[in-house]
Amino acid sequence: MVIRRTQTALTLFFGLALFAGSLVLHTGSAAAANNPSVDPSFRYGKNLTDAEQVGADIWFNATAGNARFFTYVYQQRLGVMIDWYRVLQSNARDERFHRWGLINDPDCCKPGDPNCPATSYSETYGFDYCPGDDELLQYVGKTGYRDPACDLKDVPLAQGDPHGPNDQRQSACDLEFGTSTGALGLRKFPNPKFDKVKWLQINGGHLDSWDGYTAKVTPRKDREAPAKSHLIDGSIEPPYRIGMSCGACHIAFDPLNPPKDPIHPKWENLSGTVGNQYGRFAQILGSGMAPNTIEYQIYGHSRPGAVDTSAIPNDQVNNAGTMNALINLAKRPLFEEDVVKWRKTNQCPAGGNERTCWCEPGKDGKCWERSRKKDLVHHILKGGEDSIGALEAIQRVYFNIGSCSEEGWVNHLTDMRQLDPTMRGFGQTPFDIGQVRRDCPQFRAIEDRLDEVLKFLLTGAPADLYQARGLKNNAALIEQLNKEFGKGAVEQGRAVFASKCASCHSSQNAPFEKKDFRTVSTDPKDKGIRIDWLGNDKLIPVSEVATNRSRALHSNHMKGRVWEEYGSESLRAKPGDPQLKEPSDGGRGYYRNISLLSLWAYAPFMHNNAVGPEVCGGSPDDHYHSPYVDTEGKPLASPPPCWVFDPSVEGRFKLYKASMKALLNPSQRIPKVTGFNSEVTIRLFPKLGDGKIERFIDTAILFPVGTPAARIGNFRHKELVGDLVMARVDFDKLTAKYVGRYGPEKGKQIAKTIQDKGTELLAKPGSILEAGAELREVYSNSLAVIENDGHRFGEDLSEEEKDALTAFLATL
């Protein structure tokens, strides 16, 4: 397939959600042949089929319309500002990786550099110049731009597809590729509403300056609202609308062939299956916010390589998770579960209900039927929440980053500042797949090509350390490791793994003592992949693994929540964890046993990258704040330094060894608690119906500097406000609520504490409500604070056995 563009080609792999910075050309095209930066045999990986190639093109480039979300809806509906220029300005291209963890697009250039078609920043409005911009820049402030996705050449429908044999797929134009911003995973589109005259006026007469647009504007004297910038000013339109492909979080450096200079990678140094271990997407999403706002503190504290996937569809659970690598998916375990979902069919009953069967108008036999069946599904996400099928999980990623937001899901989200339970936005409601399919063409454009995307994802393979070191085979690596860790260390480690680890971290069946964990499949269709996924993907109670439990308490897939339709009935039927104080019903309270394939390349460890050294971008990284605390929870005066990003083979291996040491010696870990670096105050003005007079409780919740970030991210402030009102108008109801939850003695005490707080606040308008320990226990979705505890399996091994296990795992 060929997507035509002016100069160059994009060539990468994929991860869990990824994309690339330029458009894609098939091997053998004239443009690829004339492009010196691209090996003509390299296109996302070697030997892809046409279907896999199309899947890669889509997954790398498609934004599916979310540029509109990130330009308008995100700011106006969620009240959170992104300063795209701060993140993407071309004059800071050399700092982009270290500061934001973004990977520079090899095909883009800084205006004014030798051989760059753009000679000045004013030509590109301060951004990099990228392939396709010669056309795109002509449409800034104008309509009529033809998206490069329109040139996508689909492969034929699979034989037997219920929607075949005629091709009735949604137009590929609705995939919306745009062009690269210069950072892989972020795409730009010309803004037809851009007003050049206004832009020059607000930015001092300079097209390449965004200073006036992003600078704080002093509020009117008669208002107490904090100063905000024109980022939220709908009357000023930027030159570009910025979109995000799923790969924004997952394209990164290939462990087998890392770049000599991470600021200047080549295409052959990049992979799409690894996950971006350096990306600071939480900080990017809050880049236009002041540090003392609740929004920034909710968004801005994830480690590099981790992101809270429910930050936008917020469930008030601070639950950052890593951007996973997708490896050997063909051997990932499947589970039979009870699934309600839409399935392809070619007809619906006459006069039927479109809520259970719907045919796309004008498309003969392109229908979908909603039914309940037993299906074999993967457990996807950290707690296995995405559990109705791989295709649906792939598509949900697009919605989670803004596709079909206005048509489909923004009105199902929580408004963090809406305190009236009778108003829209107070809580969540479920995303409706059938309704969004009907109303959003971008949904259909992605859905009609999910089979190709999945085929591409199935190409991901392990990154073997012996290959990364340029050795002949794994035996040569074992020889090296035995020299480093001791004679026979690898074989001894295999025995330790078989007896202590494989019951969770192997997809083969017990007994494990004689199993070969590197056995390659002999089935031709498997293309030489290993039979062992090195994880069983079963769900285990979080109290058993005892790692930070916040991610396991993620609630968006529960009944009545935004992603309800993406969770299986079997998931929601699982019992809660009786060992937890927090609510854990409805499918919450579990982690899955993950894969250990290529573990040497993916340190630090655990779902939040917290076990092992802290990593950072070095001196330009203004987002790093030490999380290390003493036994009393106070910041260490002299914490261990962070390890500067090092994607080299030896850099990864050193980080792996240090992380294994931390993993196997939990008593030696210095506790990590990410704290606020700025005081945060949440203003609350709930209305109180008090007899004939309606009053407002004028108060604020204060979170001082050093407050664990999890406290605010997990704090149910809306329920607190409701209880303050209930304490005034129906104290008996409030008492019954907490007696039922905690028992008579404790429940009555909690109700009395809440009543006293409400009385105090009414007596002293404008006073500060401190979130003390008694309130935190009642209103926290997760009480977990320490981020690097748990997973104590293996701490009783001898030092020799720990070294041996470290050596063996490096061979997998």
Question: Where are each of the predicted segments found?
Answer:
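Hydrophobic helical h-region of N-terminal Sec-dependent signal peptides
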Residues: 12-19
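Periplasmic c-type cytochrome electron-transfer domains
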Residues: 2, 7, 21-812
